[in-house]
């Protein structure tokens, strides 16, 4: 009778592969997390630039920006709160308001504390006035 040789991996070989995979994961995961943060910030920057452009169109039509009370909603529906818009396009200035990457709404302060208007995301923590806020006044700083 012929003895069949068993094929397979030894426990030591499996452990070596697991250790190598762990080392690779420890190198790759931090890089992926950093890229996610950069991508989230870039989305906020793009959204704020788009909102600024829409607000500039609103100002061209109405000689002023929407008030804080009217908010960014004034870009998709005609404000019902005074001062009323003199001219308002049938479809508004944008189709919908974007949300920041963390599911929060962008905020408008008009007149702003940093310029004519302040547009900002409350950041990952969702709390306005904290260090992670990203606003149109911080775009060139970070």
Curated annotation (Swiss-Prot):
Gene3D superfamilies: Glycoprotein, Type 4 Pilin
Propiece span(s): 1-8
Subcellular location(s) of the protein: Cell inner membrane
Alphabetical GO biological process terms: protein secretion by the type II secretion system
Modified residues (N-methylphenylalanine): 9
Posttranslational modification: Cleaved by the prepilin peptidase.
Stretch list, region Disordered: 122-142
GO cellular component term of the entry, any: plasma membrane
Keywords: Cell inner membrane, Cell membrane, Membrane, Methylation, Transmembrane, Transmembrane helix
Residues that span the membrane, as ranges: 9-29
Chief location bin: membrane
Membrane topology value: Single-pass membrane protein
Family: Belongs to the GSP G family.
Protein function: Core component of the type II secretion system required for the energy-dependent secretion of extracellular factors such as proteases and toxins from the periplasm. Pseudopilin (pilin-like) protein that polymerizes to form the pseudopilus. Further polymerization triggers pseudopilus growth.
Complexes and interactors: Type II secretion system is composed of four main components: the outer membrane complex, the inner membrane complex, the cytoplasmic secretion ATPase and the periplasm-spanning pseudopilus. Forms homomultimers.
Alphabetical list of PANTHER family matching this protein: GENERAL SECRETION PATHWAY PROTEIN G, TYPE II SECRETION SYSTEM CORE PROTEIN G
Entry protein name: Type II secretion system core protein G
Species annotation: Klebsiella michiganensis (strain ATCC 8724 / DSM 4798 / JCM 20051 / NBRC 3318 / NRRL B-199 / KCTC 1686 / BUCSAV 143 / CCM 1901)
